[in-house]
Amino acid sequence: MARTTAINRYRNIGICAHVDAGKTTTTERILFYTGLSHKMGEVHDGAATTDWMVQEQERGITITSAAVTTFWKGSRGQYDNYRVNVIDTPGHVDFTIEVERSLRVLDGAVVVFCGTSGVEPQSETVWRQANKYGVPRVVYVNKMDRAGANFLRVVGQIKNRLGHTPVPVQLAIGSEDNFQGQVDLIKMKAIYWNDDDKGTTYREEEIPADMVELANEWRNNMVEAAAEATEELMNKYLEEGELSVEEIKAGLRARTLASEIVPAVCGSSFKNKGVPLVLDAVIDFLPAPTEIPAIKGIHPDLIDVPKDEVKPEQFDERHADDDEPFSALAFKIATDPFVGTLTFVRVYSGFLTSGDSVINSVKGKKERVGRMVQMHANQREEIKEVRAGDIAALIGMKDVTTGDTLCNADKPIILERMDFPEPVISLSVEPKTKQDQEKMGIALGKLAQEDPSFRVKTDEETGQTIISGMGELHLDILVDRMKREFNVEANIGKPQVSYREKITKSNVEIEGKFVRQSGGRGQFGHCWVRFSEPDVDDKGNITEGLVFSNEVVGGVIPKEYIPAIQKGIEEQMKNGVVAGYPLIGLKAAVFDGSYHDVDSNEMAFKIAASMATKQLAQKGGGVVLEPIMKVEVVTPEDYLGDVMGDLNRRRGLVQGMDESVSGRVVRAEVPLGEMFGYATDVRSMSQGRASYSMEFSKYAEAPSNIVEALVKKQG
């Protein structure tokens, strides 16, 4: 089957923004104008097509990135048919993992700002992530009908706060209740939208007299920006003082793809004024899959080599071409009530037909592709093949998680792995009834497969199920999904910190002896173990787990009991020696002991080793470690004092400060135990203008007052 749309007419784009900039409404309008969706969904009614989870509709926020395939021929039918794959991304800080995951597979982005509130903290986070992946973007200033909306003010904020060069290609005609349309600076015409067809068509008129001067000024700014693309255009502009419409578009496009500028448009999605021109801007200024750098990857043999040690010549490249070997990245897993697991993939090279077998090169497993569907929000269309540049969902994948690569078995490659941050907050969840117990296990397993930043484990001592994630809202929503999608009722505990323990002395020799001999068959286990603190590398990372060695000579302990001694030490490590938290690492050598011909058995030696390990609290200088987070707070200068004072109160150590376009960036290391509720506190301290990000840095010794409280709690 031949390709239906040429690859240079593909646009893989994301709609990115902070909460409430009107991103979902904008996506809805895109679906409407591209002819797929006949009734516009409104977020207020909880009916938007891309917000397809019940929680999203209730909270009016977007959680999952739904990928939607649409087609666009231009607001005036001026193009051949373009295929636009739209990925809707969430805007809440706890879901930055979703945004990051989407940006990874996009070629370009439309960043939506609110005409009234402009650049907000979360938009700075999204902007930084887009910079990290080098995503070219177009800015759409939405909600121009709102009180206090001002297009040029937001353009100024993008320049000053985000440090990018926005180039308006439109101006707003009127604002607030009087917002009527746009001035198209490329054609130098005024555009007014028809309400009868919900803003599908528009009429062009002359620019209002009171705007001509402003329009000329901003047009010159735009033409100059376009002329700087090449020497040729610059020379023509200097000689003739003007460029043709085609030259302006070509110049702006080249500079947008190089991430030197961002074209800016405006409108009101809710009032149906302007979205078709946003789509035109996507076609005019954002890249096709063939215009972005080839994706790099490594051979599966190099999977264990640290990223920074892979030599440049060891990287493999895949170009967006049907003739190259097949490669695709799984960027999202979703559970669908009707078909089971959907694996969303972005195809980078080659093609795949349903029924083909591929390998998951990260896990080294073979997968057979059953059915393939292309999603239109929550409806789906079955397709027979996917080609380079496509985004589709595969059904029937057995063991694929987010970030895995699917490829040809004879040309394996691992595309760049996404870095998922370690979860920092944990809660205990307990099923309310026996029936819920089994369902909860299945539900948590599925949710963990969908979301790599969410982990599940069982606390061996209490038997409780512990879930960990990226923030309080993140876990709230997962618990909520468990209730709704899987009908599991659960009781939720308070947020907990994951503490660890370690010893601080080396070459400590401890005897463990377990004897029970009171008639009949007894128990006898006796060992001497030399314990040492774990090794630490030059970056301060502790060697985790047990490093065990057997130095017994002369058969004083028979060989078959040595594994039991190792097991006894490992089990006691899990339960800790000071306050009941796992030992992070330990070196142990068994070097002496004795046994009894009749009474010795594996169990006795296991208990003896465990008893020896328990004594480490006193004899080995046992300490409790707490997780230390690397915290970055971006705050306007006015609130710097408050933010610094607050970090000190939280036992934070300020590591340094930088200037940034968004204000001051404070870098600090703060114990996680002091960071609960910080999202709310930092917002109220700075009237919502400061934003922060936090990731795990290291484990460090906890102060004595914390340790005392923990020991007391363990009783």
From Swiss-Prot:
Xref: CDD domains: EF-G (cd01886), EFG_III (cd16262), EFG_mtEFG1_IV (cd01434), EFG_mtEFG_C (cd03713), EFG_mtEFG_II (cd04088)
GO biological process annotation, one example: ribosome disassembly
Subcellular location: Cytoplasm
PROSITE patterns xref list: G_TR_1 (PS00301), G_TR_2 (PS51722)
Segments crossing the lipid bilayer: none
One GO CC term on file: cytoplasm
UniProt entry keywords in alphabetical sequence: Cytoplasm, Elongation factor, GTP-binding, Nucleotide-binding, Protein biosynthesis
InterPro entries registered for this protein in UniProt: EFG_II (IPR041095), EFG_III (IPR009022), EFG_III/V (IPR035647), EFG_IV (IPR047872), EFG_V (IPR035649), EFG_V-like (IPR000640), EFTu-like_2 (IPR004161), G_TR_CS (IPR031157)
One Gene Ontology MF term: GTPase activity
Domain of life: Bacteria
UniProt xrefs under SUPFAM superfamilies: EF-G C-terminal domain-like (SSF54980), P-loop containing nucleoside triphosphate hydrolases (SSF52540), Ribosomal protein S5 domain 2-like (SSF54211), Translation proteins (SSF50447)
tr-type G domain segment(s): 8-290
Primary site of residence: cytoplasm
Residues where GTP binds: 17-24, 88-92, 142-145
Pfam families according to UniProt: EFG_C, EFG_III, EFG_IV, GTP_EFTU, GTP_EFTU_D2
Signal peptide from the UniProt entry: none
Function description: Catalyzes the GTP-dependent ribosomal translocation step during translation elongation. During this step, the ribosome changes from the pre-translocational (PRE) to the post-translocational (POST) state as the newly formed A-site-bound peptidyl-tRNA and P-site-bound deacylated tRNA move to the P and E sites, respectively. Catalyzes the coordinated movement of the two tRNA molecules, the mRNA and conformational changes in the ribosome.
UniProt family annotation: Belongs to the TRAFAC class translation factor GTPase superfamily. Classic translation factor GTPase family. EF-G/EF-2 subfamily.
Protein name: Elongation factor G 1
Gene that produces this protein: fusA
